C-alpha cells in the first residue's frame, strides 16, 4: 500500500521563512505542501517553481471565486505552473466550477471548498443565511462539485462519511483542521479531528499546519503525524 503524506501548510509570508523551515527536513524526504494566499501573493509564481525544483508536490490553495470566464482563464495560467492540486469555492456555482475544470485541464487535482473548518453552525446560518445544518450544506456543495466534474472537495473530517455516501467512495475528501491528539492549542479551526480519526472516517488527504510548522522539531512532528495517518490496525 502506497504510503500517504500529510500535506504541510506552508503558512509563511516569504521565501526566506520557507527555506528555513525546509532545512529541518532531509533532502530525500519528498513532501506534499500547501501554498496559500499569503505566501503566493508575497512571492508569486516563483515560489511554485522553487518548491517544484526540490521535487515536492504542491497544493495551491487560492480558493478562486469569480465569474466563470475569469476563473477559466486564471486556472489556465495556474496549470502552466505545474501544480499538483488546487481549488475553487463551491459557492461560485456549477458553471464556475465547470469553467475551472476546463481551464485547468485534466492533470492537476481540482477540489471545491465547501464550508471552511473555521465556520460554525451559527455563523453559517447568521452570516451566510443558509438554514441548513453544516453537514447538509457541505454535502450539497459536494454533490454540485461532482456534477461539475471536479475530483473532490475540501471539508472537515467530520463530514467525510456523509460526503462519500452522497457522492461515491472515489470522490476525494481533503480535510484541513487536523490536530494531533496531544495538541491543546486554541486557534480559528472549529471542526477538527486527529490524523487517526481522519483516516478512520475515510479522508483521502489531510492538511496539517501549525502542529508541524510551529513544532520544536518540525521533522519529528511530521513523522509522528505521518505514522499515525498511515497506521494500520
Curated annotation (Swiss-Prot):
What are the binding positions for substrate in this chain?
11, 34, 61-70, 117, 179, 189, 209-210
Known SUPFAM superfamilies for this protein? Ribulose-phoshate binding barrel (SSF51366)
Instruction: Provide the active-site residues from the annotation.
Output: 63
Q: Name one GO biological process term.
A: 'de novo' UMP biosynthetic process
Q: Which GO terms describe its cellular component?
A: cytosol
Protein EC: 4.1.1.23
Q: Which reaction does it catalyse?
A: orotidine 5'-phosphate + H(+) = UMP + CO2
Q: In which pathway does it act?
A: Pyrimidine metabolism; UMP biosynthesis via de novo pathway; UMP from orotate: step 2/2
Recorded GO terms, molecular function?
A: orotidine-5'-phosphate decarboxylase activity
Q: Write down the superkingdom of origin.
A: Bacteria
Specify the signal sequence span. none
- Key words of the record: Decarboxylase, Lyase, Pyrimidine biosynthesis
Q: Which InterPro entries match?
A: Aldolase_TIM, OMPdecase, OMPdecase_AS, OMPdecase_bac, OMPdeCOase_dom, RibuloseP-bd_barrel
Q: Which PANTHER family match?
A: OROTIDINE 5'-PHOSPHATE DECARBOXYLASE (PTHR32119:SF2)
HAMAP family in the record, alphabetically? Answer: OMPdecase_type1_B
Its biological purpose: Catalyzes the decarboxylation of orotidine 5'-monophosphate (OMP) to uridine 5'-monophosphate (UMP).
Q: Which family does it belong to?
A: Belongs to the OMP decarboxylase family. Type 1 subfamily.
Subunit info here reads:
Homodimer.
Q: What name has this protein been given in UniProt?
A: Orotidine 5'-phosphate decarboxylase
Organism field: Streptococcus agalactiae serotype III (strain NEM316)
Amino acid at each position: 500500500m502506497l504510503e500517504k503524506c500529510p500535506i504541510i501548510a506552508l503558512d509563511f509570508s516569504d521565501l526566506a521563512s520557507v527555506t528555513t523551515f525546509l532545512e529541518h527536513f532531509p533532502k530525500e524526504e519528498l513532501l506534499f505542501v500547501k501554498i496559500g494566499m499569503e505566501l503566493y501573493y508575497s512571492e508569486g509564481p516563483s515560489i511554485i517553481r522553487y518548491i517544484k525544483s526540490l521535487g515536492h508536490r504542491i497544493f495551491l490553495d487560492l480558493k478562486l471565486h469569480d465569474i466563470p470566464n475569469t476563473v477559466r482563464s486564471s486556472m489556465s495560467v495556474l496549470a502552466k505552473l505545474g501544480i499538483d492540486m488546487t481549488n475553487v469555492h463551491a459557492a461560485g456555482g456549477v458553471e464556475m466550477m465547470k469553467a475551472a475544470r476546463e481551464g485547468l485541464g485534466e492533470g492537476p487535482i481540482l477540489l471545491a471548498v465547501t464550508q471552511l473548518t473555521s465556520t460554525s453552525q451559527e455563523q453559517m446560518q447568521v452570516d451566510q443565511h443558509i438554514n441548513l445544518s453544516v453537514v447538509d450544506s457541505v454535502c450539497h456543495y459536494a454533490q454540485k462539485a461532482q456534477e461539475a466534474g471536479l475530483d473532490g472537495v475540501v471539508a472537515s473530517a467530520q463530514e467525510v462519511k456523509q460526503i462519500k455516501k452522497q457522492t461515491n467512495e472515489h470522490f476525494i475528501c481533503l480535510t484541513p483542521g487536523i490536530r494531533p491528539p496531544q495538541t491543546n492549542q486554541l486557534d480559528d479551526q472549529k471542526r477538527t479531528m486527529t490524523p487517526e480519526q481522519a483516516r478512520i472516517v475515510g479522508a483521502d488527504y489531510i492538511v496539517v499546519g501549525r502542529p508541524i510548522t510551529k513544532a520544536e522539531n518540525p521533522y519529528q512532528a511530521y513523522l509522528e503525524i505521518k505514522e499515525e495517518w498511515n497506521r494500520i490496525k
